[in-house]
Amino acid sequence: MKVLDADTVRSRVSLAAARGAVHDAFCALADGDVVAPDEFAMHLANGGELHVKGAHLGGPYLAFKAAAGAFPEGGNSGFTAVLDAATGAPAAILDDGGWLTEIRTAAASAVSARALARPDSRTLTILGGGFQAAFQVAALREAFGIESVTVWSRSPETRDRFAAENDAVATDTVADAVHGADIVICCTPSREPLVTFEMLSLGTHVIAMGSDLLGKRELADDVLLGADLLVADDVSIAGRVGELAHLAQAAERAVNLGDVLTGRSTGRTSDEQVSVSDHCGLGIQDAAMAQLVMTGGTS
């Protein structure tokens, strides 16, 4: 069994390749061509968490990702285990330290934006100034002709640092950050709504990906009620732990991203529509990244 270190993993996965692989994975999910069990999660008394997600996308490999975080004496860590789909034998350990999770999460946002944002979108707002926020900016710049980026974070130091490192403009309030943005990406651990519908402009596409556990939320109810289009990476999961979990009537009218990508559900039909995409993160994304690495960077 091979062990591929972080440098090797990173050398095999570009932003464009990740976006293509994640796009194909969502389409395969919609087509019913994947095996994707529910996530396994473990929460320890000391605050530490372990999350395991995986899938088989129909290719030569199946994979699962183990991600640990919030431990009091350590940071985030993770690895992906890859097995031969024909024999079940271990094929490789991808010792990426969680990097694949970061890029596959950002790739899903790029896929969502390409499918649902206005094609002429040029302005991007990021709520949150952490490691994932930087991946989001990079992924959206790769997928769109983004001309300006605005960032908000609760910490002035964090948002100023992020702005300097990512060629962005920092703002003091969420309302100022969101105003006039073509695409808004929420990637915070907030447990209280940050964005209200009145903050949004006509035609805005909102991606909420911080609400990946029950209790987290970034969008007020009126955003979910007022949006013309409600999409989730997986409606059933988002209805349990995502933004959609907070409002049953919103979950009832939401559609899966894969169904939009495959034409089963209607996407944006006018430049004035407000669209919302709720992302919890799926095992198919992790399997797609593993497939990329194992095939040398081709989706």
Regions found by a protein language model. Name each.
Residues 142-164:
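NAD(P)-binding Rossmann-fold cofactor-contacting core
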Residues 168-246:
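Rossmann-like adenosine-cofactor binding region
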Residues 116-123, 145, 201-202:
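Short helix-loop-beta connector
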Residues 128-130:
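Glycine-rich Rossmann-fold phosphate-binding loop(s) that bind the pyrophosphate
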Residues 215-299:
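Adenosine-phosphate binding glycine-rich loop
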Residues 1-101, 117-120, 283-287, 294:
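N-terminal ligand-binding/catalytic initiation module
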Residues 133-134:
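N-terminal Rossmann-fold NAD(P) dinucleotide-binding loop
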Residues 124-125, 275:
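Conserved beta-strand elements of the Class I
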